[in-house]
């Protein structure tokens, strides 16, 4: 019994040692600095929102040489700027215009597609259950059986005063 326990302990330690030294281990992968990039939430972030028209910071913070020269031209009179330069300055500050933000998304198509896929799969499951899981319909549901049952109830004169048999004309053999 001692040998069996010692063998188990050795295999357990060997498994842990290989997991600790292998690079494919999940524990070792979590020590890599490239797993997740941390974002400093104390600094202002950029958001395109209709309810807050001016974000806390500009859309582009890292400016190229052309962008820097355009920012220098911005400090001068705006009448000297061309339309393209004004649009470029706007795009440095904001990612989207109001009309772009108000434009409806196509997300409803994905939602409806998911709903229809779910309904289709549910229909297939119900159809499969009707074929292979549920028992056959009882014979009492057949129209022939219901007609025989009706004839038997009329022959027995069930509820003759105000009910079923009161509406049957026994002399003519038809409903009143």
UniProtKB/Swiss-Prot annotation:
InterPro entries recorded: Cyt_c_oxidase_su4, Cyt_c_oxidase_su4_fam, Cyt_c_oxidase_su4_sf
Transmembrane segments: 107-132
One of the GO BP terms on file: mitochondrial electron transport, cytochrome c to oxygen
Taxonomy, superkingdom: Eukaryota
Mitochondrial intermembrane-facing ranges: 133-176
Residues in compartment: Mitochondrial matrix: 29-106
Keywords associated with the record: Membrane, Mitochondrion, Mitochondrion inner membrane, Transit peptide, Transmembrane, Transmembrane helix
Pathway recorded for this protein: Energy metabolism; oxidative phosphorylation
Localisation per UniProt entry: Mitochondrion inner membrane
Topology of this chain in the membrane: Single-pass membrane protein
Pfam families in UniProt: COX4
Record's GO cellular component terms: mitochondrial inner membrane; respiratory chain complex IV
The organelle targeting sequence, given as a residue range: 1-28
Annotated function: Component of the cytochrome c oxidase, the last enzyme in the mitochondrial electron transport chain which drives oxidative phosphorylation. The respiratory chain contains 3 multisubunit complexes succinate dehydrogenase (complex II, CII), ubiquinol-cytochrome c oxidoreductase (cytochrome b-c1 complex, complex III, CIII) and cytochrome c oxidase (complex IV, CIV), that cooperate to transfer electrons derived from NADH and succinate to molecular oxygen, creating an electrochemical gradient over the inner membrane that drives transmembrane transport and the ATP synthase.
PANTHER family tied to this protein: CYTOCHROME C OXIDASE SUBUNIT 4, CYTOCHROME C OXIDASE SUBUNIT IV
Subunit structure, as described in the record: Component of the cytochrome c oxidase (complex IV, CIV), a multisubunit enzyme composed of 14 subunits. The complex is composed of a catalytic core of 3 subunits MT-CO1, MT-CO2 and MT-CO3, encoded in the mitochondrial DNA, and 11 supernumerary subunits COX4I, COX5A, COX5B, COX6A, COX6B, COX6C, COX7A, COX7B, COX7C, COX8 and NDUFA4, which are encoded in the nuclear genome.
Family according to the record: Belongs to the cytochrome c oxidase IV family.
Protein name per the record: Cytochrome c oxidase subunit 4 isoform 2, mitochondrial
């Amino acid at each position: 019994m001692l040998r069996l326990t010692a063998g188990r302990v050795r295999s357990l330690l060997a498994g842990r040692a290989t997991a600790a030294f292998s690079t494919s281990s999940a524990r070792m992968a979590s020590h890599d600095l490239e797993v997740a990039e941390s974002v400093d939430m104390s600094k202002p972030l950029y958001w395109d929102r209709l309810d807050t028209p001016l974000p806390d910071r500009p859309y582009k913070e890292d400016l190229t040489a052309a962008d820097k020269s355009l920012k220098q031209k911005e400090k001068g009179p705006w009448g000297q700027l061309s339309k393209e330069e004004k649009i470029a300055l706007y795009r440095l500050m904001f990612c989207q215009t109001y009309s772009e933000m108000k434009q409806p998304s196509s997300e409803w198509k994905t939602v409806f597609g998911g709903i229809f896929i779910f309904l289709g799969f549910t229909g297939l499951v119900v159809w499969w259950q009707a074929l292979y899981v549920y028992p056959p319909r009882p014979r009492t549901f057949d129209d022939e059986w219901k007609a025989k049952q009706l004839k038997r109830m009329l022959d027995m004169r069930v509820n003759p005063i105000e009910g079923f048999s009161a509406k049957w004309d026994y002399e003519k053999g038809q409903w009143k």
